[in-house]
Amino acid sequence: MREMKIKSIILCALALSGAAACTKLNVKEAPEYVAPLYIQASDSKVVFDVTGGQAMITLASNGKVSSGEVPEGFELQEEEGATYIVKAGVNTGAETVSGELVFTAVRGEETAQAKVSLVQRAGEAKNLSAEGLANCYIAHTQGTYRFNATVKGNGKGDGGSDYIKNYGVNIEGGTRATLIWEARHDGDRSLTYEVIDGAPVYHNGYITFSTGRSEGNALIAIEDIHGEVLWSWHIWVTNNPVTAHDHILPDLEGNPKVVAQIMDRNLGAMNNEPMNLENRGMFYQWGRKDPFLPSRTPYRTNGYPDINEPEDNEINSEIGDGTRPWDVFATNTAPKVSTNPGNIPYSVKYPNKHIEQFSAQSLYTWYVSSVDKKDISVTKVKLWDETKTIFDPCPAGYKVPGGKLYANFGNVDVNNPRDLTGGKPDEYTEDFHWLWEKFENCGRVWKPTGDFYPVVGTFVPMRGEDYVYNHYTGELGMYWTTSPNTYQEGESAYYEYEWIRMNEAAAFSGYGAMVYACQIRCIKE
């Protein structure tokens, strides 16, 4: 009986399996995803000055692209790869010429459009480089400007780096101007696009650009035919005139002595008002010409109960109509080189990239990965120097300050009052001897002149982080000078430079590594 039951179960199982084998499952395959039709222009607006020029417009689309009617006063030339060259001749009239280019993408019965506004001013653009060549030009809102884009920096020396010998001082092979980024201090995304108005134009060795209705900072570059950056310029848009005045340092007998003519604010700031977000300048790695943005977080009015809290250091990553997002990974090391001109060519090519030190080395520099201590030509390089170089980030007529503008410096011991130029708040009496006033309003005042110096923090990666962030905004201030470290021995000393460091507890002249990004208060050449 048991055997018959088992046999019956086996037969049933076989029958079921056979039935399953003969049954065809009716499963519908999911339809292949098809992306919506799109078309996007590299620029939404191009602005020419009265002399005209040409600009390149690139279209990205998953359809077949064609151009529409060309507005009167402009020409359009089609290139390979959905690229067009728009040209404007000399505007001989008294009025601004404007129009609109319409590009259409077609796929089957679908269509999509991208529109590009074209504007040509009737007035001649102001030549910013007429007052001197530089890596930074100051402009006002709602103006049209141009500058010489055939020379690197001020064209006058490379700090002994051999860069000019290897790469020259003239810019060759430039075909197009591009906006790398534009930004406001507050990071307002809607107004960030209003710093630069339209795309910059390269013509006959000059870059022409127009400013919008918003103050801020921007970076404009010249590229070759392959889109590689050949050089770039910081555009500082402020309606508050930048001025200079006496910087006073008492001599050993306490007598006031004018040692420089100093700028009225930090490089890239809109003002120098205590507790004002716009008193923050741009950040610079030592020796580099291209800036990084300060935090967008307002200063705390009630102090900082916790040190270096993330909410007090929000990063400003806006680029507006720029073409290159910020590249601030903490793993961004440059190629491994040990000879001059180091990684200057790499830094020129990637002005939006923060370059870190090589983790296997103790040099704390972006310049080289290793160095022969006996090779003075490498260890004594001064990319920023007492005499202005092509890498100096200050506007024409200004330069990065030299050393000893804020008292003599040396091997500073912050616990030794004799080495300090500013102390703790409770150490100040009516006859205090410090050169810096006590810490107030997120900054300190230089007593001999009354100049305010905001503590803007720094821009550097912290251990264990994947990105470079703003740190210690409103709590710590660091200002670069050109002076190298001369007192230490060992590799680290070769790439340390004087900075003015201040917080609530102290102020002093010390030394910092090249990879740090700090503030600059320019002085007259």
Question: Where do the model's predicted regions map?
Answer:
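Bacterial Sec-dependent N-terminal signal peptides
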Residues: K5-I6, L16-S42, G108, A112-K115, ...
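Short, solvent-exposed loop/linker segments at the N-terminal edge
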Residues: V46-G52
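Surface-exposed binding patches on compact interaction domains or structured appendages
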Residues: Q54-I85, A125-T208
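Extracellular/luminal low-complexity segments enriched in Ser/Thr/Pro
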Residues: T83-S98, Y202-E215
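A short beta-strand micro-motif common to beta-rich folds, especially ectodomain repeats
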Residues: E95-G108, E215-I225
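GGW-centered surface loops in extracellular recognition modules
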Residues: N127-L128, G132-I171, G227-M282
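A short glycine-rich, aromatic-capped structural motif
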Residues: D246-D372, G402-K404
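C-terminal, surface-exposed recognition/capping segments
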Residues: A269, I355-E356, A360-E525
